[in-house]
């Protein structure tokens, strides 16, 4: 198995890179989050990789961080989620956003990713629940904190704020905040001009 590639970045044609490693050019598919962290062409690059062998193809997938690679590996374990879909998920949201959506069972956030329908999003929430955050070392929070965050989100939505506004406000609230303090802080943030 190929676990890491270090070489010179030759070309970028999203989502594919060409990396020269001692005279051998490796085509590597990467999520958008990794593309944003790339150096300039002809610069040195190191990518963590996942090597996939199927009966009709051998593919390399590259990631800037171990957390991204592990999230990819968790995603492709799910029935009906292939490597392309897993890359689309990691391109559409950060690993922390994915872990939070799974922890809060927010299938609606996952359907915003191109190629992810309602059934697939629900399957992701069901099958990754309790797996993603602990495996990746992501602090999804204690169950009480997750419950409080969900209640704050619901309160802001019921007050007429859009999901986008409510999620922006949630990012400003510390994870261990109580529901009432979270709502107060969220409203204060949203009332700023």
UniProtKB/Swiss-Prot annotation:
One Gene Ontology term of the biological-process aspect is: DNA recombination
One short Pfam name that applies is RuvA_N
Taxonomy, superkingdom: Bacteria
Q: Where is the signal peptide?
A: none
Q: Which UniProt keywords apply?
A: Cytoplasm, DNA damage, DNA recombination, DNA repair, DNA-binding
* Span list, region Flexible linker: 139-143
Stretch list, region Domain II: 65-139
> Where in or outside the cell?
Cytoplasm
- Its primary localisation, in coarse terms, equals cytoplasm
Region annotation (Domain III) maps to 144-193
GO cellular component annotations of the record: cytoplasm; Holliday junction helicase complex; Holliday junction resolvase complex
Q: Which InterPro entries match?
A: DNA_helicase_Holl-junc_RuvA_I, Hlx-hairpin-Hlx_DNA-bd_motif, NA-bd_OB-fold, RuvA, RuvA_2-like, RuvA_C, RuvA_C_sf
Region span, Domain I: 1-64
GO molecular function per UniProt: ATP binding; four-way junction DNA binding; four-way junction helicase activity
According to the UniProt entry, the note on domains is:
Has three domains with a flexible linker between the domains II and III and assumes an 'L' shape. Domain III is highly mobile and contacts RuvB.
| Function noted in UniProt | The RuvA-RuvB-RuvC complex processes Holliday junction (HJ) DNA during genetic recombination and DNA repair, while the RuvA-RuvB complex plays an important role in the rescue of blocked DNA replication forks via replication fork reversal (RFR). RuvA specifically binds to HJ cruciform DNA, conferring on it an open structure. The RuvB hexamer acts as an ATP-dependent pump, pulling dsDNA into and through the RuvAB complex. HJ branch migration allows RuvC to scan DNA until it finds its consensus sequence, where it cleaves and resolves the cruciform DNA.
Please give the subunit comment from the record. Answer: Homotetramer. Forms an RuvA(8)-RuvB(12)-Holliday junction (HJ) complex. HJ DNA is sandwiched between 2 RuvA tetramers; dsDNA enters through RuvA and exits via RuvB. An RuvB hexamer assembles on each DNA strand where it exits the tetramer. Each RuvB hexamer is contacted by two RuvA subunits (via domain III) on 2 adjacent RuvB subunits; this complex drives branch migration. In the full resolvosome a probable DNA-RuvA(4)-RuvB(12)-RuvC(2) complex forms which resolves the HJ.
Family membership noted in the UniProt record: Belongs to the RuvA family.
Specify the protein name. Answer: Holliday junction branch migration complex subunit RuvA
